[in-house]
């Protein structure tokens, strides 16, 4: 399906180095963005969407989601949570390990099998149109170099430290190194223990492990000591992920430290859900608003922290609005009845943005109304469609 989105007030690029893109029109074809500019021709498009003066941004990337199998979370006994996150503007979820699978295995063969099965289960399954990167191997004692080669051979590219049966968090270090040697993106639980049997992991542990990402560095949900945060900022180049289901005060502290260090590209926004804190379809939007309103982060930079920053660390071809990127686009606006007049001023005010349309893989999933955010001030609409679908989402 070839899709044109026109009449866009502002394009939020997702690129932290250039967060506003020039233009008012985005053209999508064959699941990719083919052009970003001004006054594009919609005549040869199957679908043309009038943004109605709303802003466009890349689909949000939630880089901390506890996937299991299917669109179901045993932790909160909830069906359909991933499809619901689409209505919060989230178009990509990245597994933080399948640790919530009931009775999950703990031996090397079992954790490999779990990661491979999850990876392959979501390879072609897109709940609500969402792209799910599942299959994050839980690092356990006994894994050897050949295991990581096998995992990589099956397409597993994520590894999680923090839930294994190690005597001390320092013991994760050689396992993280093995995973990195085989091309896996490595993440480590940071902060106090989150589930029975896990342990607290602080800055010294993380620095010894040298993962790609310090997961929920603000606490998941319990934070490490304040003195540890400057160490991670100043003694490493590890990406620092802040999560909605964590400590807000330390989220703001992380943002302050990274901004002062000129390292805002290292800050990643995620939710750490579903967990004991629940299911949060709008969690990404809330953390973006917290940073913009309380941490002096420019709202377009907060958008980049939830999109392009995640994409760069996780090596994804999404998270930015640019020709050649994956065609995941969200139309956003201030919510109806509020004090602000556009999406960016809403974030700066501490409000969430309203979601007016979501397109994933170049396919409109709904246009005009989100099931989960308040109504937008302006209304996106399908101006032209040559397919038997109006994408209105009126059933919401």
Label every PLM stretch briefly:
Residues 74-82, 140-151, 196-205:
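Short, acidic/polar
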Residues 327-379:
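C-terminal cap of metal-dependent C-N hydrolases
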Residues 81-110, 122-139, 153-166, 183-187, ...:
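Divalent metal-dependent hydrolysis catalytic cores, especially in the metallo-beta-lactamase
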Residues 1-43:
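N-terminal metal-binding scaffold of metallo-dependent hydrolase/deaminase domains
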Residues 42, 51-116:
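Metal-associated gating/positioning segment near the N- to mid-region
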Residues 256-334:
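His/Asp/Glu-enriched, well-ordered alpha-helical/loop segment
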Residues 8, 31, 53, 64, ...:
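Divalent metal-coordination and catalytic microenvironments
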Residues 156-278, 295:
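Active-site core of metal-dependent hydrolases
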């Amino acid at each position: 399906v070839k899709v044109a989105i026109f009449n866009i007030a502002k394009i939020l690029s997702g690129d932290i180095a250039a967060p506003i893109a020039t233009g008012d029109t985005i053209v999508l074809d064959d699941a990719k963005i083919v052009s970003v500019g001004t006054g594009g021709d919609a005549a040869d498009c199957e679908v043309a969407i009038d943004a109605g003066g709303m802003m466009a941004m890349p689909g949000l990337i939630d880089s901390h989601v506890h996937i299991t199998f299917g669109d179901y979370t045993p932790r909160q006994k909830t069906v359909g949570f991933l499809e619901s996150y689409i209505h919060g503007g989230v178009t990509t979820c990245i597994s933080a390990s399948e640790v919530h699978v009931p009775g999950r295995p703990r031996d090397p063969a079992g954790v490999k099998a779990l990661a491979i099965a999850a990876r392959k289960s979501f390879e072609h399954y897109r709940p609500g149109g969402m792209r799910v990167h599942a299959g994050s191997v839980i690092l356990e004692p006994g894994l050897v170099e050949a295991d990581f080669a096998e995992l990589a051979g099956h397409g597993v590219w994520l590894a999680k430290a923090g839930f294994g049966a190690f005597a001390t968090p320092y013991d994760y270090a050689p396992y993280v190194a093995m995973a990195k040697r085989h091309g896996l993106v490595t993440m480590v639980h940071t902060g106090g223990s989150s589930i029975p049997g896990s342990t607290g992991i602080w800055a010294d542990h993380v620095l010894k492990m040298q993962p790609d990402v310090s997961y929920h560095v603000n606490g998941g949900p319990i934070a490490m000591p304040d003195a540890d945060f400057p160490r991670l900022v100043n003694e490493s180049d590890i990406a620092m992920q802040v999560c909605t289901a964590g400590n807000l005060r330390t989220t703001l502290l992380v943002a302050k430290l990274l901004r002062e260090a000129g390292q805002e590209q290292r800050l990643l926004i995620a939710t750490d859900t579903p967990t004991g804190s629940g299911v949060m379809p709008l969690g990404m939007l809330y953390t973006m608003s917290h940073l913009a309103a309380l941490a002096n982060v420019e709202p377009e930079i907060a958008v980049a922290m939830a999109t392009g920053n995640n994409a760069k660390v996780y090596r994804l071809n999404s998270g930015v609005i640019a020709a050649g990127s994956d065609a995941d686009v969200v139309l956003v606006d201030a919510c109806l009845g509020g004090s602000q007049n556009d999406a960016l001023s809403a974030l700066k005010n501490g409000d969430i943005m309203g979601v007016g349309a979501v397109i994933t893989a170049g396919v409109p999933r709904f246009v005009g109304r989100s099931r989960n955010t308040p109504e937008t001030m302006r209304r996106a609409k399908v101006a032209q469609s040559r397919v038997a679908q109006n994408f209105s989402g009126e059933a919401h």
